[in-house]
Amino acid sequence: MLSRADTMIRNAAPADHAALLALWQANAPRQGYASRPDAEVDRLLFRHPYFSYEYTFVRAEQGRAVAFICGCVGNDIPHGRERGCFTCLAADPAWDTPETTVQLLDALEEAFRVAGKTTSAVTFFNPMHLPWGIPGSPGHEHNNMPGIATDLPLHERMLAHGYTETTQETAMYRTLTDYAIPPEVRALEHRTAAEGCTLALYDPNRHHGLDAMLQALDNPDWTARVTAAARDGLCLPVALAGNTVAGFAGPVYPEPTGRGWFAGIGIAPQYQHRHLGKLLFFRLCAEEKRAGAVYMSLFTGVANPARRIYESAGFTSVRTFGVLLKTL
């Protein structure tokens, strides 16, 4: 705990809840976070199962909270045995300074060390998802940040504080109002079908090999989400070799915000390089629109070749985020 005559860095406590909520509501939108009613901010942040005052710190000036930082830990979080997760930092404009950032980061990082963590991380593995507004859109939003937005002073401050940017993720977006699968993609689908691979919506009574395909992809998050979608009967576009599942995109799930959600696109190794990823993504967008989604947004690595697929479907980059790690 840091303390000077009128300045104190300390753990937050339940008695600080109203002050923390007020700080968030007044200042988080400046970072691009979506505006939410108090009760919704509580659900997303201060009452979230992973929220803990043990990993929340306040800068107080003459007894008044002027900034706070929040993180979380959990051995069930991917890499959680060695990593603590940075969640957010909000500050009054007069106190939104490099000094405040360093003081709060120091406090959070020390708490991670005490908990036995060796790394402080800002990644999409953080289970506390805070929605943000998509620039230039009519109020559309994405449901979480995978890092620190590169347009924020916080990004440079964290790099200066010893964080390493391991990669950058770009947020891509398009509305679905005028979306339609173009003729050239339809033609590609016909050529691919002639070569033995077709597209369909997953039907457990007709299609097999979903589990084997997921096992080959070796992505635990995809396995959990796609298996649950198939079990629950959600719309799941798949690529087929005969009746064997060769790949997936989805599942199709319009969120209450109007966003078409999906876990990802995966093609089994033996069926790659046949344009199936592109065909599935175009089909996914059509199914999301049919199900009532009005827009889609997603993240991809700035150097990920899949970015070309998204761009060919009319998606544009709207914001870039740095994935940050620091060895403690």
Question: What would you call each of these model-derived segments?
Answer:
Residues 25-56, 61, 69-80, 217-269:
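A conserved beta-strand-loop-helix scaffold within acyl/acetyltransferase catalytic domains
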